[in-house]
């Protein structure tokens, strides 16, 4: 991911004739992209979204060279990043690594379109908890004919995509992916009733896990 900001130059031959280019992770399920990435957004911003799992750049010689031409302003220098054997998360904010391209662009006064459109799922929880969004109870996703929605007890919110990083998920084999399906924290199915069953099993699992923790402390 550290080389992603340089893709505009690295793959310039492939980008001839295109107005924009981008990068994303492979553990995503996409919804209706153009509902969120409108013509107005594309023409107003040189970069759309600031996270590594989903970013779009204007395809111009100026923007494609940002990674090496913008002053680092105390953040990570691209030459050091490209020579490092460690992951520097250079394609995003990377505050824990010293600052990446998103931070560098901000410090240079380049505005990034960064509305919360995607469901970036927190890796530290078994249940779905979305970074930069409120906590929802019994959260799952519904995909239907090209649209992806976040669903909870009294909530329905369409999202650009959902990011299922570092998560093992069982998939029902009899799913019509072009029509509709549902995604629970560890299960994908075309039957909505199975989602309710999953939440009951999940609550039981959480109770058992809590009891084990209590027992280990008592001992």
PLM region spans:
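Alpha-helical membrane-targeting segments
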Residues: 197-219
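A short secondary-structure junction signal
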Residues: 21, 32-36, 65-69
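Conserved donor-nucleotide/metal-binding helix-loop-beta segment in metal-dependent transferases, i.e.
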Residues: 30-61
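Active-site-proximal specificity loops/subdomain of glycosyltransferases
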Residues: 1-16
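Catalytic core and acceptor-binding pocket of nucleotide-sugar-dependent glycosyltransferases
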Residues: 65-205
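Short beta-strand-to-loop acidic/aromatic patch adjacent to the donor-nucleotide binding site
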Residues: 17-31
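Short, surface-exposed basic-aromatic patches at helix termini and helix-loop junctions that form
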Residues: 13-16, 21, 37-44
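Short, amphipathic alpha-helical segments
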Residues: 2-5, 24, 49
